[in-house]
UniProtKB/Swiss-Prot annotation:
GO BP annotations listed: translation
Similarity comment: family membership: Belongs to the universal ribosomal protein uS3 family.
Cross-referenced PROSITE patterns: KH_TYPE_2, RIBOSOMAL_S3
Occurrences of domain KH type-2 (ranges): 38-106
Subunit structure: Part of the 30S ribosomal subunit. Forms a tight complex with proteins S10 and S14.
Protein name listed in UniProt: Small ribosomal subunit protein uS3
Gene encoding the protein: rpsC
Length: 217
């Protein structure tokens, strides 16, 4: 049986950057667990704020957290109340000074996390899994994607035997390293158990900068 490598992990260092930007030796395990705690806490606190990527950078006793969100107004709150409260909670959680950057996602229909989250929430509201996937595919293609593939797995329609069913449109070249492919996996809690939702979105190629070869250099 063929197995697929993680599309983002395969491209890190080529066309993708790391989500955690820090270096440590003896403190590596502590920092890693702290990163996981920060991500879990932020995702829980901002479950309805359409947060996609969480980037973490570290300096001496300082943590910079960058939140990529489609709803920056909801994250910031009136007069910055929500982001101040979040910062205070993260300061208490980590025992360090936390700085929060909020980055708006201009095209949420081209973000695999947000598309997958949308499908998962529809499944929880008992929308037919085929309809949820096809509507998401149409929105993503209209937003300018070159291709999209979705897959829902589990007890579909309450069936006794779990299975997977997916749809695709356009092209999704998983083997092309210069292809900008966004991937995400989400869960939907239904009355029949959990359903897994996978989304691959091909947004075009990222070509490396052309080197200047003038003069034979």
């Amino acid at each position: 049986m063929g197995q697929k490598v993680h599309p983002i992990g395969m491209r890190v260092g080529i066309i993708r950057d790391w989500d955690a930007k820090w270096y440590a030796e003896k403190e590596y395990a502590d920092y890693l667990h702290e990163d996981l705690a920060i991500r879990k806490f932020v995702q829980k606190e901002l479950a309805d704020a359409a947060v996609s990527t969480i980037e973490i950078e570290r300096a001496v006793n300082k943590v910079n957290v960058s939140l990529h969100t489609a709803k920056p107004g909801m994250v910031i709150g009136k007069g910055g109340a929500n982001v101040d409260a979040l910062r205070a909670k993260l300061n208490k959680l980590t025992g360090k000074q936390v700085h929060i950057n909020i980055i708006e996602i201009k095209s949420p229909d081209l973000d695999a996390h947000l598309v997958g989250e949308g499908i998962a929430r529809q499944l929880e509201q008992r929308v037919a899994f085929r309809r949820a996937q096809k509507q998401a595919i149409q929105r993503t293609m209209r937003a300018g994607a070159k291709g999209i593939k979705t897959q829902v797995s589990g007890r579909l329609n309450g069936a006794d035997i779990a299975r997977s069913e997916g749809y695709s449109e356009g092209t999704v070249p998983l083997h092309t390293l210069r292809a900008d492919i966004d991937y995400a996996w989400e869960e939907a809690d239904t009355t029949y158990g959990k359903l897994g939702v996978k989304v691959w979105i091909y947004r075009g190629e990222i070509l490396p900068a052309r080197k200047n070869t003038k003069g034979g250099k």
